[in-house]
Amino acid sequence: MYQVDLPPDPKEVAAIEARRNQEREQQSRFFNVRTRVMGVDVEALNNQVEERKLQEATERSKEAAYGTNQVRYDLVAQMLEKEQAERTRRLAKKVQNFREQRQKLRNRCELDFWNSNQLWREFPAYLGDNAPYYGQASLQCFSGEDLERATYLRMQQEQFQYSLERQLQEQQQARVDENCADMLNDQLRLAMDMRAAQLAKLEESCRIAMMAATASANKAQAVKLAEQQGQEHQRQQEANLVEVQNQITSDLLTENPQVAQNPVAPHRVLPYCWKGMTPEQRATIRKVQETQHHEKEAQRQAEQALDAKWESQAINLAQAAKELEEQERELCAEFRRGLGSFNQQLAMEQNAQQNYLNSIIYTNQPTAQYHLQFNTSSR
């Protein structure tokens, strides 16, 4: 048989490469003493705890700063709300004063829509020529008959004096209100400035305290990191010294082949103590290799003999197939010759039959009149 070089399976190649990588990783973990770690890394856990504490302290300082800012904003908002409430109160007071002074009940001129006869009922019955409810349109007072002019003039002067005094009072009250408002605004601005200065000082002190705390934390962390590095360097030096001492005092540098034997599995060896094979082991391996070589040679000869048999059998089969093909061609040619003669005879018989039909049987040909006698009615 012939050997055919087939391409390797990608899945099998990937699996082999994965096993090789896993074996290399295991060897790097097992045989490298410096990188091999047994148990829990307490130092790393402590570092994580310290980092967590530092992060929490930083977050608390940030929250304190945010709280200070929030208090400041709340105070400013309260002051603004108080100022807005004061403005609203002053405006309401002015509106109320205007209503009390300008919109008195006795001076209103509105008409009561619910009582349309109110104006007529306000006028009493006829009292005389000097009745105050009747004017010039009522024909009660004619030209040259103004008997109460002095009274009217006095009342007019009193009205003017009252209006002037009221205007003076309003102007004075407006000036007083304006002065009070200005004084309150000045006091409010002064209080807001003082509060803003206090909050700025408080914020500056918080910032300085935060910076000092951050600097102290960074300094402590740097000192701790330096101590950890020094301890790590010292541990590494001690590990190197221990390794050198172990190499000197152990059986690794000896030439004793018994050191490499595994006490648990005698058929295995310890890789880090193995110094090579003994002459007996090498002789055994050579003997096994020679035996395998002889077996391989015998197998190769057997395969060659089997291949020769297969080749001879293939030649015989090819020759037999060739003979069968020749016989098949001869039979096909004979069959075609017989079929041709049979077809020729059949054609002659059919021609004779057709001539018989045309000359003897089908002598009376139908005319058009014969075909017209059919299908002449609907039934």
Curated annotation (Swiss-Prot):
Query: What family name appears in the similarity comment?
Result: Belongs to the RIB43A family.
Where would one find coiled-coil regions in this protein?
A: 43-111, 285-337
Lineage, top ranks: Eukaryota, Metazoa, Chordata, Craniata, Vertebrata
The entry's protein name is RIB43A-like with coiled-coils protein 1
Q: Which organism is it from?
A: Bos taurus (Bovine)
Recorded superkingdom: Eukaryota
Could you give the subunit structure recorded for this chain?
Microtubule inner protein component of sperm flagellar doublet microtubules.
| GO terms for biological process, alphabetical | flagellated sperm motility
| Record's keyword terms, sorted | Cell projection, Cilium, Coiled coil, Cytoplasm, Cytoskeleton, Flagellum
Q: What Pfam families does the database record attribute to this sequence?
A: RIB43A
Where does the protein end up?
Answer: Cytoplasm, Cytoskeleton, Flagellum axoneme
* Disulfide bridges in this chain: none
Q: Which GO terms describe its cellular component?
A: axonemal A tubule inner sheath; sperm flagellum
